Regions:
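Amphipathic alpha-helical and helix-coil boundary elements used as assembly
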Residues: 1-323
Length: 323
């Protein structure tokens, strides 16, 4: 949810720091204030000699939407606009599905996505003879001839180059160092880009319907069931083997349609909405050696129909419609 990290190093330990806001950063302990001076000067202090600020084109609006089957009429669309003063700022990015089910979640995620989109639009790059600038810390630049560049920055990337010329002949300095860096103005919200996407499934999977011991059907008011997947090494083939999973039917309307709840022990085919492993849905059933077709095959292959069977305790009662 917009959380990012960096390391703080000390002689005794290395600390992983997590934050989601610019005020979670500290000033560089040894260089909270740094001056700019022209390259080539020999000064008895560390300084920055090169810095260039830039503005980039960024989309100015982020729109997200999703669908919740428990509240199908809910309006979950969320829009956040934060355009920069550049060209193409009126463009928008539309994301579906947003992977949320409440308006509050949608507003938060849309804001974070917009901040991540806007964040790289204002950056500065530079270099200097300074060793104490560290990624994840802030400092304030001073003495630059362009007043707007003199401000507080967050160091989002640093690279330290060291060169030892002690074994070389000549009059060059025996030891030189330069730090290059990328800066983000602290007056702007810093939000890193998403570099990893949510894992997606590939194709449907086979599973066995499960439920409590002694039951033949285990469902809820939505007609959902629970299953155990073949790859699940730790499930116990019971009512806790999975989340509730929706079932697709040939016909479904408001108070009408076709319904047959998959029974415990039946093999079903489970696919995933939008490839999301958190949104399984049963899209079909299939026979296997334990649950064979209702009449002999291939001898009766020409017959088609529907065949029902009574639950436990109801005897061997069957009803069918054959074509």
């Amino acid at each position: 949810m917009g959380i990012y990290w960096w390391f703080e190093h000390s002689e005794n330990c290395h600390t992983l720091v997590l934050t989601d806001a610019i005020n979670g950063h500290k000033a560089c302990p040894d260089s909270p204030l740094v001056e700019w001076h022209q390259e080539g000067l020999k000064l008895d202090k560390e300084f920055i000699h090169t810095i260039t600020a830039s503005e980039r084109l960024r989309t100015g609006k982020w729109v997200m939407d999703d669908f919740d089957f428990m509240k199908p009429r809910s309006l979950l669309k969320s829009t956040v606009a934060s355009p920069r003063n550049t060209g193409h700022a009126e463009y928008e990015h539309y994301e579906w599905p947003g992977d949320y089910f409440t308006t509050g979640e949608g507003e938060m995620l849309t804001r974070i996505r917009m901040e991540a989109q806007r964040s790289p639009g204002s950056r500065a790059h530079g270099a200097g003879h300074i060793r104490t600038l560290m990624t994840g810390y802030t400092f304030t630049l001073m003495n630059h001839p362009t007043a707007e560049i003199n401000q507080e920055y967050l160091l989002v990337q640093t690279t330290l180059f060291l060169r030892d010329n002690a074994q070389h002949s000549g009059q060059d300095q025996h030891f030189t160092y330069v730090t290059t860096f990328e800066l983000h103005p602290t007056r702007e919200v810093y939000r890193p880009q998403r570099t990893l996407s949510k894992p997606h499934t590939k194709g449907p999977q086979s599973a066995i319907v499960t439920g409590p011991v002694g039951q033949e059907i285990w469902t809820d008011k939505y007609g959902r069931v629970k299953v155990q997947f073949g790859w699940d090494r730790y499930g116990n083939n019971d009512e806790n083997s999975s989340c509730w999973i929706r079932v697709s039917y040939p016909w479904a309307g408001k108070g009408f349609g076709m319904i047959q709840i998959p029974r415990i022990g039946q093999e079903v085919l489970v696919d995933f909405k939008n490839g999301d492993p958190d949104l399984p849905i049963i899209v079909g059933r299939t026979y296997n050696q334990d649950t064979m077709p209702p009449w002999g095959l291939p001898g009766m292959a020409s017959q088609s129909g529907i065949f029902s069977h009574s639950l436990q305790g109801g005897g061997d009662q069957r009803k069918h419609a054959a074509l």
